[in-house]
Amino acid sequence: MPRGPVWDVAATRVTDQLRIPRLGAFRDGPYGSVLFYDGAESMRRLEENPNAKSRPRGYSCEELGGAMWAPGDDLGAAQRLSLVRPLFVSPEGTGCSRYVATLANDDGIWATWQQGQADGSQPLVMNHLPADEVERLLS
């Protein structure tokens, strides 16, 4: 994927492709995918402009999470959903939120990602969206 225009100008790395389940409004239509990616503004510490708003370190050299939408499996046609700012930023620590991985099965959708914490650690965290909730959201 090409680098982004703003917060992800230094790096864009797709970490996961989640095919949208064929449920609800997506049951009969063309299918698509959500691509999760890690982006970074810079891969080194940036000196901030003293007249600009100070930002946490995570906005300069740690990866934050973004998303794209792609029709079918045509990853080359993917369009950014997080054009001017990341979609996934931890409310804790440096804001780091990266390395998304998903699994969709009959039980629903499982997602894991690395998330910055107040104590500076960055553990893997997980969420499960049950199948009935996936169907409700896509209907």
Region spans (language model):
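Beta-rich carbohydrate-recognition and catalytic domains
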Residues: 1-23, 27-94, 104-139
